[in-house]
């Protein structure tokens, strides 16, 4: 029988906008956040509360970002997260949030109510950030309550020059699945750090960080947007 995972029922009919953290506002993150904005509008048209997104990125817009990422010359020197979210909010009339810092927040691990969201989306180009994130998230695997701070899924983007992958896994230990005579429901999907042996990957190979010309030699101009479209297409079919 074909294996299938049914989306957590809570996300299909929540009493609040589904909370999403987008970590990284670069080539992929800027495309993903824009796609999520369009998805939120579509969900609201169908009677769903939509999405509330917070974008995290400590970097500022540089000349190397213009062209490969969704930034313009007028945004040079601005926080990537703030520039991206401000543009989305103005266009769609949202009140999404921008954080010019890394996630997880340093204080989160020690706070009684850590900063969490229903869906965590990572769009970073380094391994260490993924490992640090998982050390934080796995502490919340047994989180069973349903509210805007309940962590349920982690989706990770990764790409090389002309290829990439999008992998979604459970933060929550197990997700209740319906009985099916046609499929084999899977209550738990591995996250990226459980699927990939990062100890075998060299950090220098995890993504480009250079001028636009050099970046285009290492990474196809449209690989980020291809991955972002794949993600939003997947999420749309889940909801």
Report each predicted region and the residues it spans.
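Glycine-rich phosphate-binding loop and adjoining beta1-alpha1-beta2 segment
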Residues: 52-92
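Glycine-rich adenosine-cofactor-binding loop
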Residues: 19-41, 57
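E1/E1-like adenylate-forming module used to activate ubiquitin-like modifiers
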Residues: 118-227
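Conserved small/polar residues in nucleotide/adenosyl-binding loops
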Residues: 232-239
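A structured beta-alpha segment of the ubiquitous adenosine-cofactor-binding alpha/beta core
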Residues: 79-117, 124-128
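N-terminal charged helix/coil linker that caps or initiates catalytic domains
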Residues: 1-20, 41-46
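Alpha-helix termini
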Residues: 11, 39-50, 137-149
């Amino acid at each position: 029988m074909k294996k299938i995972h049914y989306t957590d029922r809570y996300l299909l009919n929540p009493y609040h906008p589904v909370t999403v953290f987008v970590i990284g506002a670069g080539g992929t993150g800027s495309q993903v956040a824009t796609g999520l904005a369009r998805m939120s509008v579509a969900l609201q048209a169908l009677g769903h509360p939509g999405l509330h997104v917070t974008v995290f990125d400590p970097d500022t817009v540089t000349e190397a970002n213009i062209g490969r990422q969704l930034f313009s010359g007028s945004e040079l020197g601005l926080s990537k997260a703030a520039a991206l979210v401000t543009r989305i909010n103005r266009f769609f009339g949202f009140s999404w949030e921008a954080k010019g810092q890394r996630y997880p927040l340093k204080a989160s691990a020690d706070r009684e109510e850590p900063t969490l969201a229903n869906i965590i989306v990572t769009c970073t180009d380094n391994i260490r950030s993924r490992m640090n994130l998982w050390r934080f998230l796995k502490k919340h695997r047994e989180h069973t309550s349903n509210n805007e701070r309940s962590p349920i899924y982690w989706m990770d983007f990764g790409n090389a020059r002309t290829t990439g992958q999008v992998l979604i896994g459970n933060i929550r230990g197990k997700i209740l699945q319906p009985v099916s005579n046609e499929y084999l429901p899977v209550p738990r999907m591995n996250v990226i750090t459980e699927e990939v042996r990062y100890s075998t990957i060299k950090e220098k190979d995890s993504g480009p960080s250079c001028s636009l010309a050099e970046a285009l030699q290492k990474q196809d101009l449209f690989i980020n947007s291809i991955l972002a479209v794949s993600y939003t297409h997947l999420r749309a079919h889940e909801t």
